[in-house]
């Protein structure tokens, strides 16, 4: 990274970002560059004025390579957007990438994965959420009966209290038994 990028983020702000994330100074500057590339004039103008809370709207954010092809991009943006609008500040974007980094603990990843897959935001993953999850993963190409069968199996295997929903604790327990989860819930920086 050249001096032009680091000059836009104060040393104090870089230190704060390093304390609040799992990233090095160099990684933060690299992440800043990808954020800036969404709308260079808007970001540079705000950062030069010391405004690190400039927001990219959802349509700009989903152009990021890390999100562009994800079937969950709308949920990811909403969950990591401080106001749940899907619009993101650089801090929101940095938080998202930090949680999805290989350095983030599995518990933190699990908590955010739960929020992303809780499509109706009712603090549990129910049949409707699981239908949506399976449909998104498969590109909405499965028959309803097949999706229902998969959802039935998920609930049979994972719903410990047999109430038809997965709590955050049940969901986290499932993910702890899944060694590939951390690697799959990952965005390389």
How should these model regions be labeled?
Residues 85, 122, 161-163:
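Acidic carboxylate motifs that coordinate Ca2+ or other divalent cations, activating on Asp/Glu
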Residues 12, 154-189:
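C-terminal interaction modules of eukaryotic adaptor/scaffold proteins
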Residues 104-108:
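Short pre-active-site segment immediately N-terminal to the catalytic Zn-binding motif
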Residues 38, 79-80, 115-119, 156-158:
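Calcium-binding motifs, dominated by EF-hand helix-loop-helix domains
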Residues 1-72, 77, 82:
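Eukaryote-specific detector of the first structured module of a protein
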Residues 47-68, 88-101, 115-116, 125-142, ...:
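Amphipathic regulatory helices of Ca2+-sensor modules
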């Amino acid at each position: 990274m050249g001096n032009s990028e680091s000059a836009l983020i104060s040393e104090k702000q870089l230190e704060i970002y390093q304390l609040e994330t799992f990233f090095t100074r160099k990684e933060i500057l690299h992440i800043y560059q990808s954020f800036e590339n969404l709308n260079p004039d808007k970001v540079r103008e705000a950062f030069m004025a010391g405004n690190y809370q400039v927001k990219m709207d959802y349509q700009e954010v989903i152009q990021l390579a890390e999100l562009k092809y994800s079937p969950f991009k709308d949920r990811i943006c909403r969950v990591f957007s401080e106001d749940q609008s899907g619009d993101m500040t650089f801090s929101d974007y940095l938080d998202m990438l930090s949680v999805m980094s290989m350095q983030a603990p599995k518990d933190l990843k699990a908590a955010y994965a739960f929020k992303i897959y809780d499509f109706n935001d009712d603090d549990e993953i129910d049949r409707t959420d699981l239908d949506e999850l399976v449909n998104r993963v498969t590109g909405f190409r499965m028959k309803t009966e097949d999706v229902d069968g998969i959802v039935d199996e998920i609930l049979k295997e994972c719903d410990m209290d047999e109430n038809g929903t997965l709590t955050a604790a049940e969901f986290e327990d499932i993910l702890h038994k899944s060694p590939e989860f951390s690697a799959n819930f990952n965005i390389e920086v």
